[in-house]
Amino acid sequence: MHLYRSHTCGALSRGDVGQTVRLSGWVHRKRDHGGVLFVDLRDHYGMTQIVADADSPALPILEALRVESVVTIDGEVKARSEGTVNANLSTGEIEVFARVATVLSAAEELPMPVAGEQEYPEDIRLRYRFLDLRRETLHANIVKRTKVISDMRRRMEGAGFTEYSTPILTASSPEGARDFLVPSRIHPGKFYALPQAPQQYKQLLMVAGFDRYFQIAPCFRDEDPRADRLPGEFYQLDLEMSFVTQEEVWETMEPVIGGVFEAFADGRKVTPIGSFPRIPYAEAMLKYGSDKPDLRNPIIISDVSEEFAQSGFGLFEKIVGTGGVVRLIPAPNTADKSRKFFDEMNDWARAEGHAGLGYVTRKQGEFGGPIAKNHGADKMAALFDRLGLGPDDGCFFAAGKAEQAAKLAGAARTRVADQLGLIDKDRFELCWIVDFPFYEWDEENKKVEFSHNPFSMPQGGLDALNTQDPLTINAFQYDLVCNGFEIASGSIRNQSPETMVKAFEIVGLSKADVEERFGGLYRAFQYGAPPHGGMAAGVDRIVMLICGAQNLREITLFPMNQRAEDLLMGAPSPAALKQLRELNIRVVEQTKG
């Protein structure tokens, strides 16, 4: 017999009754039933119930052990009595009567429990991540993550893609987030950077004559912590294709991403492959108040600026007259809601930094609220009829500058749906957001900036850059969204040196700046560059959605905390003086004040 096990803890069944077996694993739980000890023995594969009675030499050994100790059990497989079968375990029809117990590693008192799913402080969970990873849900999430990535690879290879690895040490790039810099020992005073994404390398692969590249790429960004993003490191399914239009990218990737969701849906509905809605950015901002719309939410925002332009309702009329907008957010079937519901929504909007959220109530066709009183019942009825709202539907209003009103309306749309229980949690709703603006106005610096990816092809090409107002130019850029999360982003690339120079010129960078900052790509484009495009899908977010996890730390092996600290390994940490000298680096204390 094998030194440690003849079977795993998830392998035994009724067909093994009568066999002598050897199992090894962790003591998950212990239950003392007066001279009979029941132990749940756990390994990576499952759980088996071990029984030790007064006649078993294993009893005193197991009684003395703390949970999470590692043991080897020799014993006989027996069938459980009918009333004690556990249908929740693959081994639930049997138990192993222990004859011998060998302690492989005794556990100290635990700083946190492993059995059960109770909440525990995050700093403890991260400091003792090796214990946290033993917990059932987190352990299953990590296993599922690996299976999702394997499924992605299989689907990409099936679609004709080949995996290539691009460098981890590269040059610092000025666009995007801050780089993680790596000092060069051989070249004092110079630095490598960890890649924020393999963007330039994958485009260079297309110029080099490769086609249909992909990799599961680690990406590094020195960003301030955010609730929906892990600090430091993340992974993306990165891909690029030559001689393609954006429609061909969508048609190629829907079976991959949609197929992954279908494979791990576990009964949840998924938007059918080939029918992902394609929503222009401007339409998304109007109807959903977001470029990451959750299409499980049935609420549609409407622009009602014209209705209030000459309405006599002073506040809205003034806003529209000075170039602002009024957006209406339906609140369906709220006739039974008290005024408190509507007032709390208004209070919430103010707490979020907005002027407020106006509202109209309606019950059996009768309107209520100050806006309805000022606007008049007939006008409100006509507006409700035009929008298809019913006799028991209320609504909210977001008014102000277009961007601010859209943001408030989008947040209100989400909050109303949550409050009213309108979102079906058992669906994955996917859609493409297309026709992003190529440029945007940077109010703080009073200048035009790229809104998305500077390497994208502007719609209309060089001619559009030369003749149009930059803020009216759209790009061949697109995002893939699922349930309110951006899970992928991509574009058709700009492979023309002239167009590239002009695009950067509009944001204030000269040809010399382009050659200095993006020299490799710029030079490559002068030697025959094919039309190409691609995208990158966030592996972490896709896995988070599939697992139904609340945050990215629940699907990541060894994440940092929100202060970008690895509490388990103690990173970041001071470097030894010898290391600093070799790198020609001196640490300067920050002065306070």
From Swiss-Prot:
<feature type="region of interest" description="Aspartate">
    <location>
        <begin position="199"/>
        <end position="202"/>
    </location>
</feature>
<dbReference type="InterPro" id="IPR004524">
    <property type="entry name" value="Asp-tRNA-ligase_1"/>
</dbReference>
<comment type="similarity">
    <text>Belongs to the class-II aminoacyl-tRNA synthetase family. Type 1 subfamily.</text>
</comment>
<dbReference type="Pfam" id="PF00152">
    <property type="entry name" value="tRNA-synt_2"/>
</dbReference>
<dbReference type="InterPro" id="IPR045864">
    <property type="entry name" value="aa-tRNA-synth_II/BPL/LPL"/>
</dbReference>
<keyword id="KW-0067">ATP-binding</keyword>
<feature type="site" description="Important for tRNA non-discrimination">
    <location>
        <position position="83"/>
    </location>
</feature>
<dbReference type="GO" id="GO:0050560">
    <property type="term" value="F:aspartate-tRNA(Asn) ligase activity"/>
</dbReference>
<dbReference type="InterPro" id="IPR029351">
    <property type="entry name" value="GAD_dom"/>
</dbReference>
<dbReference type="InterPro" id="IPR012340">
    <property type="entry name" value="NA-bd_OB-fold"/>
</dbReference>
<feature type="binding site">
    <location>
        <position position="221"/>
    </location>
    <ligand>
        <name>L-aspartate</name>
    </ligand>
</feature>
<dbReference type="InterPro" id="IPR047089">
    <property type="entry name" value="Asp-tRNA-ligase_1_N"/>
</dbReference>
<keyword id="KW-0030">Aminoacyl-tRNA synthetase</keyword>
<feature type="binding site">
    <location>
        <begin position="538"/>
        <end position="541"/>
    </location>
    <ligand>
        <name>ATP</name>
    </ligand>
</feature>
<feature type="binding site">
    <location>
        <position position="493"/>
    </location>
    <ligand>
        <name>L-aspartate</name>
    </ligand>
</feature>
<feature type="binding site">
    <location>
        <position position="175"/>
    </location>
    <ligand>
        <name>L-aspartate</name>
    </ligand>
</feature>
<feature type="site" description="Important for tRNA non-discrimination">
    <location>
        <position position="33"/>
    </location>
</feature>
<comment type="function">
    <text>Aspartyl-tRNA synthetase with relaxed tRNA specificity since it is able to aspartylate not only its cognate tRNA(Asp) but also tRNA(Asn). Reaction proceeds in two steps: L-aspartate is first activated by ATP to form Asp-AMP and then transferred to the acceptor end of tRNA(Asp/Asn).</text>
</comment>
<keyword id="KW-0547">Nucleotide-binding</keyword>
<dbReference type="GO" id="GO:0003676">
    <property type="term" value="F:nucleic acid binding"/>
</dbReference>
<keyword id="KW-0963">Cytoplasm</keyword>
<dbReference type="GO" id="GO:0005524">
    <property type="term" value="F:ATP binding"/>
</dbReference>
<keyword id="KW-0436">Ligase</keyword>
<dbReference type="InterPro" id="IPR004365">
    <property type="entry name" value="NA-bd_OB_tRNA"/>
</dbReference>
<dbReference type="InterPro" id="IPR047090">
    <property type="entry name" value="AspRS_core"/>
</dbReference>
<feature type="binding site">
    <location>
        <begin position="221"/>
        <end position="223"/>
    </location>
    <ligand>
        <name>ATP</name>
    </ligand>
</feature>
<dbReference type="InterPro" id="IPR004115">
    <property type="entry name" value="GAD-like_sf"/>
</dbReference>
<keyword id="KW-0648">Protein biosynthesis</keyword>
<dbReference type="Pfam" id="PF02938">
    <property type="entry name" value="GAD"/>
</dbReference>
<dbReference type="InterPro" id="IPR002312">
    <property type="entry name" value="Asp/Asn-tRNA-synth_IIb"/>
</dbReference>
<dbReference type="GO" id="GO:0006422">
    <property type="term" value="P:aspartyl-tRNA aminoacylation"/>
</dbReference>
<protein>
    <recommendedName>
        <fullName>Aspartate--tRNA(Asp/Asn) ligase</fullName>
        <ecNumber>6.1.1.23</ecNumber>
    </recommendedName>
</protein>
<dbReference type="GO" id="GO:0005737">
    <property type="term" value="C:cytoplasm"/>
</dbReference>
<feature type="binding site">
    <location>
        <position position="452"/>
    </location>
    <ligand>
        <name>L-aspartate</name>
    </ligand>
</feature>
<dbReference type="InterPro" id="IPR006195">
    <property type="entry name" value="aa-tRNA-synth_II"/>
</dbReference>
<dbReference type="GO" id="GO:0004815">
    <property type="term" value="F:aspartate-tRNA ligase activity"/>
</dbReference>
<dbReference type="InterPro" id="IPR004364">
    <property type="entry name" value="Aa-tRNA-synt_II"/>
</dbReference>
<comment type="subunit">
    <text>Homodimer.</text>
</comment>
<feature type="binding site">
    <location>
        <position position="486"/>
    </location>
    <ligand>
        <name>ATP</name>
    </ligand>
</feature>
<dbReference type="Pfam" id="PF01336">
    <property type="entry name" value="tRNA_anti-codon"/>
</dbReference>
